[in-house]
Amino acid sequence: LSGRVGDYNIGVIDAVVGANGDLDSQNAFVGRVTREILDQSTVGALVTHGDPNSDYDNLLLGTDFQYLTNKFLNNYRLEVNAFAVATESDHPDFQDGLAPVFGGSVVLPADEFDIEVGLMHVDDNFNPAMGFAPRTGVRRYYTRWAYKPLIESKDWLRQVYYSYEGEYITDLSNQLQSSKHLITPLHLLFESGDQILLEIENSADVPGNDFRIYNAAGDENDVFIPVGDYSWTRGIFGFQTSSRRKLQFQHDYSFGDFYDGTRTEDTSELTYLPSKHFGAEISYSNQDVELPAGDFNIKLASLTALINFTPDFTWSNVVQYDNVSDSLGVNSRLIWEYRPGARIFLVLNQSYLEERTGFVRKQMDTTLKLSSIFRF
């Protein structure tokens, strides 16, 4: 249930999760409230309760604030974000009371430049059972600076971009875990809408334990990155045609070092938009990695097709294959907006596993969802 009451935006999901194996049936709850304050700013709160993957209790509480103004230094738009979240669980691995996450960011976008800085602190015991935390026990510092002047002296060139993006992640003792520096010395936007870019990326990683970086289905030769202090540099070249074209193409090629080896990656996307009723996209990426611990290749291909029968009735399809899991996934979704604000979703998901005789279906599920807006 979601909606607006006065100055408040409210969203609630309450679900009963059925018993599965050793897990009993339980209730899962998510609630979110925001309120507009000042001219364009908001303050909000978030609560989740339940753990669909265990019988342990889990509670998450959070609050956030976003400040927006278009009058910073009289001419600029300024965005300031701040948030704080904490979890509490009776799981034996997370019983040290509230485990907090907090952070904030400042964004200053303008016609000729962009500036963004942010930081985040994640406690060791942070455990959002209704979400996920890619890394815990870390502090993350981030910044991005871009200069993007319009070019009026060249008829064929519209804009040039120069940028720097940096990320620095430490543990809670401020010891480096990983870092990334991405420099864009050349990014040209032509009057045709086509673009080319060149980027240089320097990365560092200090893993405290050996970790598996590659494991293919049926492959006993896992590839591990040993404990160490790694630093490497890569180059990235890309171009893409204008989004105004019926037939669009994008290609990115990256090359260089990777941990104590090398990695190259080719990614291509071809998009066809002949009319407002149909669109299709084919994408393919090929990644070759050579490491002292072993070499491997990763291929990923996908096909997306969207059919708009009418403005109110659409059919979208996604097919994806990768050679690591040797699996093919299919997602098909029908959406019918039978009246303004009221929709019916019919979703079909299938997964196939590649075997010697061809693809064999391993899983299929169908979901029917109703969504409606009520005004009162």
Residues covered by each model-derived region:
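A residue-level signal for conserved active-site and pocket-lining positions in enzyme catalytic cores
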Residues: 1, 33, 65, 145, ...
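Structural motif corresponding to the C-terminal cap of alpha-helices
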Residues: 41, 67-69
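Exposed, low-structure sequence patches enriched in small/polar residues
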Residues: 71, 75-78, 83-376
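Gly/Pro-rich turn-and-neighbor structural signature
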Residues: 53, 61-64
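A conserved hydrophobic secondary-structure block that centers on an alpha-helix together
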Residues: 2-56
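Residue-level detection of beta-strand scaffold positions
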Residues: 32-34, 46, 64, 83, ...
